[in-house]
Amino acid sequence: MIVIMDNGGQYVHRIWRTLRYIGVESKIIPNTTPLEDIKAMNPSGIIFSGGPSLENTGNCEKILENYDEFNVPILGICLGHQLIAKFFGGKVGRGEKAEYSLVEIEILEEDEIFKGLPRKLRVWESHMDEVKELPPNFKVLARSETCPIEAMKHEELPIYGVQFHPEVAHTEHGEDILRNFAKLCGEL
C-alpha cells in the first residue's frame, strides 16, 4: 500500500483515484498522522501531496528525518517536491511567474520514474514557488523554460520530486509516471 500524505492540496484525491485506477492500493492520511501509526500501516511507498504552504506539511519532514525507519520510495508532488528540496539543503523561492497552466517539460534523464516516456511532455502546473537551487546529492531529471528543476531524484535513495501534477488529467503520461512510481514500490 502507498500512503499519501495530505498537505491540503486541491488534487490529493486525484492521486488516490489514479493509483486505484491502475490497481494500486493507497490511502490518504492527514499529514499530522504520528510516525508510529504510519509505520504500522507498513507502506511500500509514500507520496507527499501538493498544498498551500511549506509551514503546513505536518510530519512529512519527520518521515525524511527518519527515512531509515521507513526505507521506501518517496515521491513529492509540487509542495512535496519543494519540501524534499528544502529538507536536503536546496533552496525554494518564488518562480519567475506563477504557473497555473500546461507547461512543456524536457526529460533530461529517463531514470525509473520517466521510464518509457517521450522526452517532452505537457504537464499541469499549479504553483507560485519552486525549487531554485538543487540540494546536494540530487540530480535534475526534467526542466522547462520557466522552471529549471521540474523533477529531481536523490542520487542514492529512491526519493523523487516533481514540480508538476502527474495526477491531473491534463498532464501527458501522468498516469504512467504514477505507475512507474508504484513499480518502484513493488506494487505492480
UniProtKB/Swiss-Prot annotation:
EC number(s) reported in the record: 6.3.5.2
GO CC terms, sorted: cytosol
Annotated signal sequence range: none
Active site: C78, H165, E167
Single GO term (MF): GMP synthase activity
Pfam families attached to this UniProt entry: GATase (PF00117)
Keywords tagged on the record: ATP-binding, Glutamine amidotransferase, GMP biosynthesis, Ligase, Nucleotide-binding, Purine biosynthesis
Top-level taxon in the UniProt lineage: Archaea
Catalytic activity entry: XMP + L-glutamine + ATP + H2O = GMP + L-glutamate + AMP + diphosphate + 2 H(+)
Pathway where this protein functions: Purine metabolism; GMP biosynthesis; GMP from XMP (L-Gln route): step 1/1
Annotated Glutamine amidotransferase type-1 domain residues: 1-188
Residue ranges the record marks as coiled coil: none
InterPro entries reported in the protein's UniProt record: Class_I_gatase-like (IPR029062), GATASE (IPR017926), GMP_synth_GATase (IPR004739), GMP_synthase_A (IPR023686)
Keyword set includes Secreted: no
Assembly description: Heterodimer composed of a glutamine amidotransferase subunit (A) and a GMP-binding subunit (B).
Task of the protein: Catalyzes the synthesis of GMP from XMP.
Name this polypeptide is given: GMP synthase [glutamine-hydrolyzing] subunit A
Organism: Pyrococcus abyssi (strain GE5 / Orsay)
Lineage, opening ranks: Archaea, Methanobacteriati, Methanobacteriota, Thermococci, Thermococcales
